Amino acid sequence: MANLRVLKKEIDYRLEEVVFDCDMAICFQPSKEKEIFEVMQEAVAVRNDLFAKAMNPAEPHNPSLVRKHYAALRAEMDDVFGKLFEKLSKINEKK
């Protein structure tokens, strides 16, 4: 983990990927626009939650705990955005 700026850019990048995939899904399956839009809204809420956690570590004056906090945040980010991609895939599989 290099620094907070890199982490925030990574969170934004993941959000952009989800939103782009949702836009493409809407283009190909306009009948599922409402379900896909809900995934987009959930992704934005996740981004805001992750930013709030990134900006407010539990113990900001203890470098060891800050590193652990950011490592846990990165793992949570991978997990949550992975679940959003899976949710979008399930929506796209339905006919």
Model-flagged regions — what are they?
Residues M1-R5, I91-E93:
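Long amphipathic alpha-helical segments with strong coiled-coil/leucine-zipper propensity
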Residues L4-P30:
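N-terminal acidic leader/helix
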Residues C27, S31-K34, E38, A45:
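Surface-exposed, polar/charged faces of alpha-helical domains
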Residues E38-Q41, A45, D49-K95:
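Low-complexity intrinsically disordered segments
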